């Protein structure tokens, strides 16, 4: 399955990614509804990574456009108090959105989207002031499941399998096989990269370009990743495609692309690498040419 992913991601201003085939939105930054227009009505599930305003301020209009019984479903970190406040305000502000369902999530919780598809949350340390027991920022992994016939039964005839299914139950004949279709880091420091291993598509933030630049910043601000760290880590993982976003607007297109190519060469990254440039909406990202 080649997913149709459209997104906008500029640090400080707005971030969102729409996965069309899954009717799913990752974050809901400003401008999503007027950008997607009627396509925004296809969104059934919204997964918010954290409460920073550049990830949630497009939600009011999007929710009003999509509001119907039980949809859209909005999922968010359980201790992100500003998002809970946004739920309360939106229901007071607009009667039409009262049927929207809001779901707080903890770490490693699963959300079943359909029989063969679920999303799993993963806590990160983006929010500096979060206590160890608090979940204020999440990444997400999207899994597709299929039932595969157990090796003990592969040589049996259809009739024999039917009889066994009646006797033992169909579920006893198969194993569940999970495929990690897509992973989304949200805003996060460069950490716990092993959790993204074996994903087909990783969307990861790269706010700054180099470790040296990150080292000069204040340590009490919310934490982010660098392009250098991400590509160094991805080089050791089994990932099919990398999408980089959340670049700071301080960088030009030329600076970002040159750095991507330089670090891909330095760390021997050979998988396709796509990027979302600051200030630009990128349509159908996976069908565009990779930068490397």
Where in the sequence are the language-model features?
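Conserved beta-strand hairpin/beta-sheet module of binuclear metal-dependent hydrolase folds
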Residues: 1-39, 138-142, 148, 175-185, ...
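Acidic/glycine-enriched edge-of-secondary-structure segments
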Residues: 17-25, 39-52, 206-225
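Active-site neighborhood of phospho(di)ester-bond hydrolases with catalytic His/Asp-centered motifs
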Residues: 25-29, 44-54, 76-77, 183-188, ...
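Active-site metal-binding motif and surrounding structural segment of the metallo-beta-lactamase
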Residues: 32-77
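Metal-dependent catalytic neighborhoods of phosphoester/phosphodiester hydrolases
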Residues: 58-65, 85-92, 252-261
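Active-site neighborhood of divalent metal-dependent phosphoester bond hydrolases
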Residues: 72, 79-106, 250
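Binuclear metal-ion centers of metallo-dependent hydrolases, dominated by the metallo-beta-lactamase
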Residues: 97-114, 191-292
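Active-site-proximal loop/helix segment associated with metal-binding centers of metalloenzymes
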Residues: 117-197, 201-206, 210-211
